[in-house]
Amino acid sequence: MTTPVRRRGRTLRQRLLGYITDAVDRLRKAWSILTLAQTRLLNALAGIRPGFSSGTGAKLRAAIAAFNTSLAAFARTVGAWAERWAATDLPLIYREGAWTLLDNADRRQATFTWTQRHQTAITALSAQYYVDLTARIQEALRRARAFLRAAQDASRDAGRGRFDIAELREQHPLDTVVYANQARHPVDAWARAAVTWQAVTTANTAAARTSMDELGISYVEIRDGADCGWRDHRDPDRADRTLRTVQDALAHPVAHAHCQRELLPRMDLIGRTNIMSGAEL
């Protein structure tokens, strides 16, 4: 029906990879403060016999104090990461999404400016994602404190010969995050999925708004994984190499974590209104 757009330069995913990799690396390093603190406390407990004695009490207090110090350091570091990601990185990613679309439309990057509509869009996205991330951080802190309470409770059990270090780690795995379905996932896997979702959503929102506001485009061409659905990965309405209205693209900038979706401008369809959103190329 129409001729597909030929990309000019790097794909959106290639342009975002540096932001995603850097953010995941920084988040991983911040989280390592927490996991190392847990390991140090468990190692300290391994050399302490549960029960009440002056020697045991002093060693336990020192180990707990060290854990609390590390917990505070984790909270500061990961909180600073979330602030930088929301306040600095996401606006840069938004601009990158706009620039990528303009490059593919063979328009100057200076066509994009921080209009009120763009500012409103990035402010809403940044605020939403900051809340999401800080909620995850608060949950990690809650779980860390639960682990500490469990260790303290075990220390009072004089009937124990030794702390069951393996049991404490198994019941309180601080190197994981817990999803809504109660499934535990490694921090690294969660971090990459969350950061990628937020980055691609932000960039594609910018691309869609730039299409509409700066170029007056009604339709964008979708490039995505061959098996990816439009609303979610299993949606039988396939996304790749279809035409979508800009409004539909704003409603579904991504379909799932690690989504490869990219919006390409259809300058040749400006003024057309008779194409059904979802039409195949």
Task: Specify the residue positions occupied by each region the protein language model found.
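Acidic, glycine-rich two-metal-ion catalytic cores of nucleic acid-processing enzymes
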Residues: 178, 182-278
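N-terminal leader/targeting and assembly helices and adjacent pre-domain segments
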Residues: 1-178, 274-281
